[in-house]
A protein has these predicted regions:
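Bilobed "Venus flytrap"/periplasmic-binding protein-like clamshell domains
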Residues: 1-62, 156-161
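Residues that form or immediately flank small-molecule/cofactor binding pockets and catalytic motifs
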Residues: 2, 34, 72-73, 187
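Residue-level detector of short coil/turn "hinge" positions at structural boundaries
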Residues: 21, 66-67, 173-174
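Short, mixed-charge aromatic SLiMs
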Residues: 31-37, 129-130, 186-191
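Pocket-lining segment of extracytoplasmic ligand-binding domains
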Residues: 35-127
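Residue-level signal for threonine
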Residues: 86, 155, 184-187
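Secondary-structure end/capping motifs
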Residues: 91-173
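Conserved C-terminal helix/tail region of periplasmic/extracytoplasmic solute-binding proteins
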Residues: 160-197
Length: 197
């Protein structure tokens, strides 16, 4: 089992293309580290790889493989991840949470309104300045942060998609939590039509 996003998207794709639960269960999903997926695919160790983002773009640019589907093809634009803080941390440090969230929100919007080449150049500067011996080669494939909402605003849909899937595949009997109880946009300066200062 792959777990997480890759497992859910694979299952959704198979089900939406006519496979029943019995057939889906016959698909052997293997967890392979993302950095090893392309090599495993090219060496024939696996038949299909759930390549995402830069890993996918790099593999496609090298040729010899093709994209079968993207989660966007059947889910549309959505944000698949989020930052989380513990409730007690938020209560003790609301200004810190607001500053962090504002910084992330502004960075998301800056990357959307700035020419791609400039964003990549800035990322390269940051990468180099960190001094961690990280190569910037993969940055040439960067497109976006994969965040749907303005400034990273979250919606119920980002959570309901997955809770519905968990119910459909029998991992839970009923959805007992409301998506709205899982997140807040309270600290995001773009909430309610706002803009950051």
């Amino acid at each position: 089992m792959l777990g997480g996003h890759s497992q859910a998207v694979l299952d959704l794709y198979l089900r939406r293309n006519g496979l029943g639960a019995g057939d889906v269960a016959k698909v052997e999903a293997l967890a392979v580290p993302p950095v090893s997926l392309e090599q495993s695919l090219r060496q024939g160790r696996i038949d299909v790889a759930a390549l995402t983002g830069i890993f996918q773009d790099k593999a496609l640019a090298a040729g010899g493989v093709r994209r079968v589907f993207r989660d966007y093809d059947f889910l549309g634009a959505f944000t698949a991840g989020s930052y989380v803080f513990r409730d007690d941390f938020i209560e003790r440090n609301p200004d810190t949470v607001r500053a962090f969230t504002t910084g992330i929100a502004k960075a998301i919007e800056w990357s959307r309104t700035t020419p791609r080449e400039e964003v990549i150049a800035r990322q390269t500067e940051i990468l180099t300045a960190r001094g961690r011996n990280e190569g910037p080669d993969a940055l040439k494939y960067w497109k976006s942060w994969g965040v749907a909402g303005r400034g990273g605003l979250m919606t119920d849909r980002e959570f309901a998609t997955w809770s519905g899937w968990l119910k459909d595949v029998g991992q839970i009997k009923e959805v007992k939590v409301r998506p709205r109880d899982l997140y807040t946009n309270e600290f995001n300066p773009y909430a309610n039509g706002g803009t950051p200062r």
